[in-house]
Amino acid sequence: MIKLKIKYRDNQTDLRFPCTEKEMNAALERIHAEDVTPLELYVSEVVFPDELSCLQDRFVNLDEVNFLGKRMDSFFGDEEYQFYEAMKFEGFDTLPDLINLSFNLNRYPLIQNIGDMGKIGREYLLTVKGCLPADDADDPKYADFGRKLIQSGKGVFTEHGLLFVDEDTPFVRDYDGQNFPAYVYEEMLCFLRAEYNGKTEFLYLPCEEEAIDKAFARLGAPTPDDVELSWEDICIENEKWTERFKEIAAEEGVYELNCLAAAVNSADMDLEKLWAVAEYAEAEDAGQLARLAKNIDCFTFVEGANYFQEIGEYVTQNNEDFTVNPTVAKFFDYRAFGEHIGEIYYGKFVGGNFIYNDTDTSLLDILYQDEPMTMGGM
């Protein structure tokens, strides 16, 4: 977590990173800096962490700070100490350098316990390589390697341990100071590569629309249509929806895809039901699909139903308003009742399932929410 006091003219406010675009905009509005471009503001104070005091009394790019905040928020174990000690060792004091450092911590092993040669060797190699066999912790090769490390004199004593620089591990500059490298910070459905004029950005949907705006601006693209999109990953375990999402991206664009991704991005979203509802409603575009997803509870989904007899049985068993007394159940005409349900609630068989809407919200109201309704012939 990073907290800065940012200043614009005579106004200043606190802002914590990482933050959402909405939170950043709210902070900018508080100091009347919402129209400042590029988004570089003066840092009057680094509230925390103290180790980033190099950012104080200078102008910084808030999007860079936010990206760094996300990277630091993902640090695990002693990685934050590694980061600070490597930063001091290298003399890094710019945001591009700090962002790149966050991707290169494997170059800087930090050994906190130097009393056990085996642990020294193993921790060093684990940092550099990322993984080691779990069943050879007692292998003497680690102690031999640890002893050579200590005898080399290359370790630098720091506040948090003995810092080494692995010369065989190159320092890779993923961030060029303009376009952010790929980094998945939060759970997402769609991971896309956006390219224009030799530059690359990455989109993680669903996201705030302004995040897409900023990515395209960093690319220098005149319009969204000028950006070439390709898929890195899609986290939807449903082949039909995977193909539908790709079609929407190609035919309608990333903003429409983002709205749909936001609508379906919930742990309890039943994609099979949504697919059936979309067929039932004959949804034409991403906007209508998103509205159906937001109103999915308006629809009753009878999975695997092919006959009205099944509908009658389902409704009488699952809707207390239509419960049938067991003493007369054998005389009840479930098929006729199922047909009645289909008629009054506009039910339809679709793809081996049955969909109906027994709420006060009509299908037309759902499909055309926020759209002007027109009357034919006028």
Model-based region annotation:
Residues 14, 130-150, 321-342, 347:
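Amphipathic alpha-helical packing elements
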Residues 1-26, 182-209, 356, 373-377:
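Short, extreme N-terminal segment that most often corresponds to the first beta-strand
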Residues 28-139, 161-186, 206-330, 365-368:
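Mixed-charge (acidic/basic) macromolecular-recognition segments
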Residues 141, 333, 367-378:
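Non-Sec secretion/translocation targeting segments of pathogen effectors
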Residues 7-9, 114, 143, 159-160, ...:
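Residue-level signal for functionally critical sites in structured catalytic/ligand-binding pockets
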Residues 1-2, 11-13, 37-42, 138, ...:
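Generic structural motif recognizing short loop/turn segments at the entrances and edges of beta-strands
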Residues 147-181, 339-371:
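Long, highly charged low-complexity segments enriched in Glu/Asp and Lys/Arg with interspersed Ser/Thr
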